[in-house]
Swiss-Prot record:
Biological process annotations from GO: malate metabolic process
Active site: 101 (proton donor), 172 (proton acceptor)
Organism lineage string: Bacteria, Pseudomonadati, Pseudomonadota, Gammaproteobacteria, Vibrionales
UniProt gene name: maeA1
Enzyme Commission designation: 1.1.1.38
Keyword RNA-binding on entry: no
Coiled-coil ranges from the UniProt annotation: none
Similarity annotation: Belongs to the malic enzymes family.
Source taxon at top rank: Bacteria
Protein name: NAD-dependent malic enzyme 1
InterPro entries hit by this protein: Aminoacid_DH-like_N_sf, Malic_enzyme_CS, Malic_N_dom, Malic_N_dom_sf, Malic_NAD-bd, Malic_OxRdtase, NAD(P)-bd_dom_sf, NAD_malic_enz_proteobac
Length: 562
């Protein structure tokens, strides 16, 4: 654990020091520091510990009634005193994660311009495309190692939010630090402002982004390319996480850059990794393998197809053929089951179509096969929702699945809560408590006939902080598919249900540091094995992970000149 006792030498003093969130201690500055840094009279007389500050901050937090007000309050602390912010969040991680990230962050993105207080990260506008290098040089953090970037076009299940999408990179990087121990000094949220096609945003006098229809096609690609090249010039070793890009751009960008730079797409690969890890744990708890499951997806976009491909890869690693694995995965979108010969399918969807030979004897009352048709005929053991369309896991669908599967695995993963395919209480009730449920957004435990059923949040926060920590620990040059698969396997080994046969599918968030370190070790080991990181011994790797794991504690300050 990186708990360095050495002093930090700081060139700032007075109001400038108090206005620097990474360095500000507020009332915790010692008497000696107050003299050295010209802070006397700028703070109340009492010197407090960080725990005393946390207690006051938590009291203030509890005084707010709405989740949005709580979100704004926490963001204000983050922009004032980052060490205090992360200590507060770590002390109350289960309570506050839904406030700093999903589901509350969705509303914060929709209202970004209305609740704006202070700039954070970088806004890289298409209008300023000739000055991207200068913009990157303006970043307040100089030693950047992790970047989360969005263009705001597909924010959660809420669509095009323009620069309002900045709330997602800010929230994601908060979790890199709170869950994965990555110092906030190493992080940078970025939004690529290429305009918006959201008429509400364009008509809103408060909207702060570039008022222009979205740039598309070759102009868009050239802009992203110039941005990537500028990042490579400024921070050549930084990990870039692509976040909430629209389907038409997400997969092409990933394919274009994954073998050129150290990057991944959390919506596609992070969601896939946490889902595969959760499914592996569920299968282990049931004494079966993932390769023995029949899996139906509702939602065949880049996220759904990314999960499907990761599941297929794990099935193949368990010993079945790629052809056999694909025959057990059924993708359903708004037009029904994806089948060979369907028009207008994207390349990544084409790889997941079902053969007519599989569906030739299926029964249906209409052209094509609906979700209910697929459940009746394919008889899935796993049902995964990534559609962003609420309520489509109906009672009829769930109970039809339950007819032929005594322990159905149901993952309605769409975010935010308002977009979930079915609420856990209904799924538990419809299956008389037999279903194993995990969701994308947080839900309270369900009580059914006197028994309590914990509802696990199958959230990417179990995965991406550990991936980032592993990449940083060995300075990996790429994020490979095999590294992501190792993250899934490491997560599965943390499952209380798989280990003990009881309890929740995933560990509680209070254990997220242990989970992230285990994932980091597995990811880093695979990076070394694949030659995308320098080789180090296992014990040295453990030390490197601990040394990179930042904790929110105040360091002693000594004054120095610029």
């Amino acid at each position: 654990m990186n708990n360095d006792k050495r002093p930090l030498y700081i060139p700032f003093a007075g109001p400038a020091l108090l206005s620097t969130p990474l360095l500000n201690k507020g009332s915790a500055f010692s008497a000696e520091e107050r003299i050295s840094f010209n802070l006397e009279g700028l703070l109340p007389e009492t010197t407090e510990t960080i725990q005393e500050q946390v207690e006051r901050a938590y009291m203030q937090y509890k005084a707010f009634e709405s989740d949005m007000d709580k979100h704004i309050y926490l963001r204000n602390i983050q922009d004032t005193n980052e060490t205090l912010f992360y200590r507060l969040v770590q002390n109350h991680i289960t309570e506050m994660m839904p406030i700093i990230y999903t589901p509350t962050v969705g509303a914060a993105c929709e209202n970004f311009s209305n609740i704006y207080r202070r700039g954070r990260g970088l806004f890289v506008s298409y209008a300023n495309r000739d000055r991207i290098d200068d913009i990157l040089n303006n970043a307040s953090n100089h030693n950047v190692k992790v970047i989360v970037v969005t263009d705001g076009e597909r924010i959660l299940g809420l669509g095009d939010q323009g620069i309002g999408g900045m709330g997602i990179p800010i929230g994601k990087l908060s979790l890199y630090t709170a869950c994965g121990g990555i110092s906030p000094a190493y992080t940078l949220p970025i939004v690529l402002d290429v305009g918006t096609n959201n008429p509400q945003r364009l008509a809103d006098p408060m909207y702060m982004g570039w008022r222009h229809p979205r740039i598309t096609g070759a102009d868009y690609d050239a802009f992203v390319e110039e941005f990537i090249q500028a990042v490579q010039r400024r921070w050549p070793d930084a990990l870039i996480q692509f976040e909430d890009f629209a389907q038409k751009n997400a997969m092409p960008l990933l394919e274009r850059y994954k073998n050129r730079i150290c990057c991944f797409n959390d919506d596609i690969q992070g969601t896939a990794a946490v889902t595969v890890g959760s499914l592996m744990a569920a299968c282990q708890a049931a004494g079966s393998k993932l390769s023995e499951q029949r899996i139906t997806f509702l939602g065949a976009g880049s996220a759904g197809c990314g999960i499907a491909e990761a599941i297929i890869a794990q099935m193949v690693s368990e010993g079945i053929s790629d052809k056999k694995a694909r025959s057990q995965v059924f993708m359903v979108d708004r037009w029904g089951l994806l089948q060979e010969g369907m028009p207008n399918l994207l390349d990544f969807q084409q790889r997941l179509v079902q053969k007519h030979s599989v569906t030739a004897k299926w029964e249906t009352e209409a052209n094509g096969f609906s979700l209910l048709d697929v459940v009746k005929n394919a008889k899935p053991t796993v049902l995964i929702g990534v559609s962003g369309a609420p309520g489509l896991f109906t009672q009829e669908v769930i109970q039809e699945m339950h007819k032929h599967c005594p322990r159905p695995i149901v993952f309605p993963l769409s975010n935010p809560t308002s977009r979930v395919e079915a609420v856990p209480a209904d799924i538990i009730r419809w299956t008389n408590g037999d279903a194993l449920v995990a969701t994308g957004s947080p839900f309270d435990p369900v009580i059914h006939e006197g028994k309590t059923y914990p509802i696990v949040q199958c959230n990417n926060s179990y995965i991406f902080p550990g991936i980032g920590l592993g990449v940083l620990a060995v300075n990996a040059k790429r994020v490979t598919d095999e590294m992501l698969m190792e993250s899934s396997r490491a997560l599965a080994t943390c499952s209380p249900l798989a280990i003990n046969g009881k309890g929740a599918l995933l560990p509680p968030l209070e254990e997220i540091h242990t989970v992230s370190k285990r994932i980091a070790y597995a990811v880093a080991k695979k990076a070394i094995e694949q030659g995308v990181a320098l080789e180090i011994a296992d014990d040295a790797l453990q030390v490197a992970i601990e040394q990179h794991f930042w904790q929110p504690v105040y360091r002693r300050y000594k004054r120095t000149a610029f």
